[in-house]
């Protein structure tokens, strides 16, 4: 070795010389074994390497890391979450992302002092970057991945919050089985409808729905169109006559509600779960295309079947859009609630509210106001004050809302059957009036935290409507299922179920029922944290819905009698406007004329789909015996309010830009900005809700989804970019 080269080393010339020597050595070594195919592979690899290491890619990534992240002692970020941030950055800037290992080298180039730790329980631990935090000015900001989050956890000792900072991945639901569909033996079938054909159709339809669910979990949304087309246009000829039966149409509606509920729970298990923008866009695109796919698949099928399929699919699409909008509202509220400075100012403004005047105005608007209502308002005021004083996380506020609805609506309505709608209306009137008066009082007094309260008020109102609608839809599902099973003694009883929304049932003689008559809803407990008092569990509370319009979203055609028309030839409100063919008449359905155009190749194969029932089948409807006493609620999907009243689903309705700015008020003197130094929260990958774990058994409106082949799936892929990391799919959530 020449020592002259080491006295004054020239790094560029030395590295180029070493690289040239290595290349020559490799060429000499493999020159005799090089084939045409190998040369082609080498060229392809060289092109890929050149594309991955463009001159502008690494500098741009380093600049992006410098703008969005900083060194912070005591802060851990999951390696998968940071890589998902990087994939989102590459997609927005139209650059080719590198693999996870290469990205780790780029991170260490920007932050050399960064370390890696494996955190988590045994068998479920994940790698984390230790010593790096997200800047508050970053679009990926989350309080738990920032310096403030680390300081807040160390000071308060609430480390249980950090346990929930794992991003959700629909891939973790791979292998989910649908609950059992209705059993044909529990249905009241007309004599003209063969039981064997109905049972066969239910089996076929369950296989079809299970395939759709598995396809959605794998993020292959485009395959849903193929499954819909092949099932409905490949229907065996002997099954075509039963499709126009009102009983089969109702069965399809109930099964669709189960499927849509399962898909909604897989894509967005809770509105508090943080979702990236890429996943939100994929969900919205799927919701938009579903109706178009059904129009093609249901071509030339009976009109009543088409109507119920279209209606349920459109409502399901609205559900997905509503959930994404409410999810965004919750993430914006999370940023406000987790800021100590903002909550301190909110507490000060909250205690300056004229509670006595607001309470009097609220009671004046109520139909039957009593002293119990006044005590209830004061109690709720004190509970919210305690949450602000303790600087509780957003999960505690959601749990408080769950407890409030349970105490003021569920328990009160349980004392009197059929009074849920009246009790919910009474409580919703009081809740809305009180919240509006509080916002008005803060506006008149130019409260510095008015913007924060306005955002929290919007989120609270949406979530309360969400809970009340879920309760109402559960009650309507019970009534509909009783009608399908024929538990009503006469046709008039079944018609009364259909007309419930148009004509409310006549209450029994006596004073109107209200929350004031429940001692549990007005009794003021001793001072304690509202979080420490768990709300009693009840089935199907915190799922989905809103109590603005009391029309149930699953509208079915219910037979009043075997082949008998409605009395006086009047059309029922929830019935289809088109003529319904009699189930006793055998009719032919035209052959699908666009098979080649849409790529239809053959009939639907029902036998190739295995592992449908790894466990013995059990009746999923134990709460529906043949007697009139119903011991429990049915498990069906709740739905949401209309988009006309809460138009939060458009891209222009994002809350941060308009609320997170310091705007001048009518007050003549300078006022402190509403949300000082609070970044946007449009992308958050952490903090699933606490209450979802607590109410896991009671929130589902049907039997919880089971899992199959646990050993074959990795259920802890806690990030939506599983397709990029695992390499199991060609497209992913970040696409």
Curated annotation (Swiss-Prot):
Q: Which Pfam families match?
A: BCD_RFX (PF25340), RFX_DNA_binding (PF02257)
What residue ranges does this record give for the DNA-binding region? Answer: 44-126, 61-136
The segments labelled Disordered in the record are 27-59, 501-538
Q: Which GO terms describe its biological process?
A: cerebellar cortex morphogenesis; cilium assembly; dorsal spinal cord development; forebrain development; midbrain development; negative regulation of smoothened signaling pathway; positive regulation of transcription by RNA polymerase II; regulation of protein processing
Which species is the source of this protein?
Mus musculus
How this chain assembles, per its entry, is: Homodimer. Heterodimer with RFX2 and RFX3. Binds DNA. Interacts with GPS2.
Q: In which tissues is it expressed?
A: Isoform 1: Brain-specific. Isoform 2: Testis-specific. Isoform 1: Highly expressed in the suprachiasmatic nucleus, the central pacemaker site of the circadian clock (at protein level).
Q: What is this protein called?
A: Transcription factor RFX4
